């Protein structure tokens, strides 16, 4: 390859930063998070890997990559669980915790070197594809952040940001926009005539696709830059072909022809290749239907078209016939098969029973739109508010379950099936953890929280634990948080033991393939896949425990694997692959690892750094950060540093400018920032000279301002008592009072919220700064005294 060693190494390191950030936020691929943690555990091997990779690429060392591809393997996890018994007319008053596996998902498992190479190749192909495709408006998933590419540079090295960890836009924002845009276009269409909204999904898309690497040249218009990465493309093709061959031994329906491949779940490249592959597919649908709106999120489509028939004629058959008339689909030959394949994309299919139709009348009150839009708005606004104590006072069961009643009726005869709401359950866990953070849990509160967790463990018992395995880490974090903040001295935690043993028991004795869809796995391979699935589930369980323990090692969750869990937890902490939101003080986990290797990251930092030498950011840890380091975190960090390093005061101008430059450097955003954000002047007020610092604000400012004045006081005794007793007024109730006042002020439209002097503990400041940022408000308040040995600030 034509790149120098220095350029190639820089590109590989940049690619690694981006893949690390992507998997940091991913909740599915815990085995890759573990792979990253183990990769960074040995500093020498970690750095050497980039050297070896760079030299192998420059010399186009095929044997080296052949050896890596030979280590290819797969992971397998449950995709869908179903009830063992057939539905009856009897309404059962309990949740079915005895479901079993109907479908599975396969994930690619490769050495970290191939993950890095895959990310590097993905970035290069994305840069090349920008020239032809730009931003695809109708596709909402897998979008690259605009800052990843320099559009005035065609060169693959100069034209890609290899310094930062930025890569994809947050999935939840695009998913929400996918829904909001659909309803917005629907409203516009209803101003003209009745509208029909169709919801379609592509059947087993990642396994059904037949991608050929030879098609890349045509897809990218024979771009000359493809030749620069032809060797990497060749390695990628061999990897895809090897994985396709491997999975086809187990999963039915993968009939390989020529050099076609499926898309490996677990790599970053399919996110991009999927969009290139479906570009013509999207255009064909838009041309054939001329829809009011067309939006696709991965393999889910929302299509809005003018309604040409009456509501009672809109059925799944009508939709299928319409798509056939437009030349988009054709029925499979098999009489029993209800699948329809897309013309020109014969490997891609939709299922009749999964077609959803919604009819909207032009001049009618379309309540469905209003309810859906309200739900989207509420989810967004709720996420901006601080959690309140209702999350404890309300029983967990009130949140996590609902009846699928007939018409919302409260009559006994209309009560439907009791169902689980995992979204509400997982959200309540997150809110509880945020509320508990940096509080002293009194005995009476501990009992309430234990009741909450016991209800939670009942919710996740039996098959529900397997079905919602994405919540394992979060549950263990909450249990550990309760143990640490309530100063529980017991060696073993009964709540953690219960959760762990319940999961292991179901895996060992209850989980089966008896209900497996006959189209999933070859019968001769079922036993092999099932053994692998059980092994992978147990490995995921151990990884979930270790990720929680990265916050505090003292917790003994299991007996047999205790030493193994702690060793892995240390690796997660060293690589910073764990939940940063629960770290007690901003950027504590970015200090030199030898200084924090054994410290609890959950305990409240009473006198955090009386040893001033500890309080300095590590030189390498921020460089390999998996996330964006926020400006408010740096302000709080450096403010605390000024109190711990015997600095007399915090200089309003020079310190702010220094922090701003540090912020830009840490996040590689120098090209987006201004030279200076702070200007200093002074004025005299009542005979006192006051220094003023003007900080540039780029956000829109309102024409009128409203000030929220919380009705609370701080006594002199309260202010002084916090010096003697750090736990003074640091309970859940005190934190909830602060949060409730802030929420109430925002709901009333306040732009400024003022709290009294000596009111806000500095360890709660991050919650408030993030709240202010999300709600575009300013918070003014006095901090409680800060201790440093025998000094107070």
Task: Describe every region a protein language model picked out.
Residues 309-461:
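C-terminal polymerase-core module
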Residues 757-793:
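Catalytic-core segment of enzymes that process non-peptidic bonds
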Residues 1-232, 256-257, 313, 511-512, ...:
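Conserved two-metal-ion catalytic palm core of "right-hand" nucleic acid polymerases
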Residues 113, 117, 269-278, 445, ...:
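Phosphate/oxyanion-binding active-site loops and adjacent basic polyanion-contact surfaces
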Residues 20, 27-46, 677-752, 759:
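N-terminal, active-site-proximal structural segment of metallo-dependent hydrolase catalytic domains
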Residues 109, 303-307, 361:
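Short beta-strand-to-loop capping motifs
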Residues 183-298, 304-314, 349, 414-571, ...:
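Conserved polymerase palm-domain catalytic core
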Residues 521-691, 698:
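Charge-dense, extended regions
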């Amino acid at each position: 390859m034509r790149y120098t060693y220095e350029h190639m190494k820089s590109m590989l390191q940049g690619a690694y930063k981006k893949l690390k950030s992507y998997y940091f936020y991913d909740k599915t691929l815990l085995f890759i998070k573990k792979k990253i943690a183990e990769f960074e555990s040995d500093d020498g091997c970690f750095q050497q890997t980039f050297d070896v990779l760079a030299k192998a690429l420059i010399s186009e060392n095929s044997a080296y990559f052949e050896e890596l591809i030979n280590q290819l393997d797969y992971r397998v996890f449950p995709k869908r669980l179903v009830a063992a018994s057939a539905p009856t007319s009897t309404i059962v008053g309990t949740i079915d915790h005895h479901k079993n596996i109907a479908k599975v998902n396969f994930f690619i498992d490769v050495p970290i070197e191939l993950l890095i190479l895959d990310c590097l190749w993905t970035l290069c192909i994305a840069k090349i594809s920008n020239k032809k495709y730009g931003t695809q408006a109708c596709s909402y998933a897998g979008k690259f952040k605009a800052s990843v590419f320099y559009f005035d540079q065609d060169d693959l090295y100069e034209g890609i940001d290899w310094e930062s960890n930025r890569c994809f836009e947050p999935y939840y924002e695009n998913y929400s926009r996918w829904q909001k845009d659909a309803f917005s276009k629907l409203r516009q269409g209803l101003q003209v005539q009745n509208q029909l909204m169709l919801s379609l999904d592509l059947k087993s898309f990642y396994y059904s696709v037949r991608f050929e690497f030879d098609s890349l040249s045509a897809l990218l218009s024979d771009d000359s830059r493809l030749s620069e990465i032809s060797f990497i493309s060749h390695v990628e093709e061999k990897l895809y072909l090897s994985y396709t061959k491997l999975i086809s031994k187990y999963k039915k329906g993968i009939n390989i022809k020529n050099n076609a491949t499926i898309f490996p779940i677990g790599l970053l490249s399919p996110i991009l290749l999927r969009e290139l592959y479906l570009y013509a597919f999207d255009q064909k649908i838009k041309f054939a239907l001329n829809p009011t709106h067309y939006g696709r999120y991965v393999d889910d489509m929302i299509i809005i078209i003018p309604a040409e028939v009456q509501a009672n004629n809109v059925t799944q058959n009508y939709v299928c016939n319409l798509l056939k008339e437009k030349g988009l689909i054709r029925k499979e030959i098999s009489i029993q098969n209800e699948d329809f394949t897309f013309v020109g994309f014969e490997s891609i299919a939709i299922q009749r029973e999964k077609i959803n139709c919604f009819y909207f009348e032009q001049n009618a009150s379309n309540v469905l739109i209003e309810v859906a839009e309200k739900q989207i708005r509420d989810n967004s606004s709720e996420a901006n508010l601080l959690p309140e104590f209702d999350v404890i006072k309300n029983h967990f069961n009130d949140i996590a379950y609902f009846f699928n009643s007939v018409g919302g009726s409260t009559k006994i005869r209309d009560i439907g099936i009791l169902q689980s709401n995992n979204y509400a359950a997982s959200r309540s866990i997150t809110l509880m953890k945020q509320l508990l953070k940096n509080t002293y849990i009194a005995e009476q509160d501990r009992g309430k929280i234990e009741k909450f967790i016991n209800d939670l463990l009942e919710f996740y018992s039996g098959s529900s634990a397997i079905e919602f395995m994405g919540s394992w880490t979060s549950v263990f974090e909450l249990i550990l948080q309760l143990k640490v903040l309530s100063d529980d001295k017991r060696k073993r935690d009964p709540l953690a033991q219960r959760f762990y043993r319940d999961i292991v028991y179901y895996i060992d004795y209850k989980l089966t393939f008896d209900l497996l869809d006959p189209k999933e796995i070859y019968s001769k391979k079922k036993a092999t896949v099932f053994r692998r699935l059980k092994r992978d589930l147990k490995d995921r369980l151990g990884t979930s425990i270790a990720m929680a323990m990265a916050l505090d090692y003292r917790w003994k969750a299991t007996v047999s694997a205790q030493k193994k869990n702690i060793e892995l937890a240390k690796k997660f902490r060293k690589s910073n692959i764990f939940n940063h939101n629960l770290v007690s003080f901003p950027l504590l986990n970015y200090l030199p690892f030898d200084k924090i290797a054994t410290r609890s990251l959950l305990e409240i930092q009473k006198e955090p750094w009386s040893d001033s030498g500890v309080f300095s950011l590590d030189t390498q840890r921020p460089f390999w950060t998996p996330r964006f380091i926020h400006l408010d975190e740096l302000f709080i960090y450096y403010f605390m540093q000024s109190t711990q390093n015997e600095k007399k005061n915090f200089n309003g101008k020079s310190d702010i400018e220094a922090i701003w430059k540090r912020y830009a450097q840490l996040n590689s955003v120098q090209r987006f920032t201004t030279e200076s954000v702070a200007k200093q002047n002074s004025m005299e007020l009542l005979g006192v000279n006051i220094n003023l610092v003007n900080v540039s604000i780029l956000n829109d400012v309102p024409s009128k301002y409203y000030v929220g004045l919380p009705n609370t006081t701080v006594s002199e005794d309260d202010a002084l008592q916090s010096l003697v007793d750090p736990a003074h007024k640091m309970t859940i109730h005190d934190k909830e009072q602060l949060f409730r006042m802030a929420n109430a002020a925002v709901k009333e439209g306040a732009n400024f919220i003022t709290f009294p002097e000596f009111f806000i503990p500095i360890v709660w400041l991050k919650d408030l700064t993030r709240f202010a940022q999300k709600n575009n408000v300013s918070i003014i308040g006095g901090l409680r005294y800060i201790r440093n040995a025998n000094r107070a600030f």
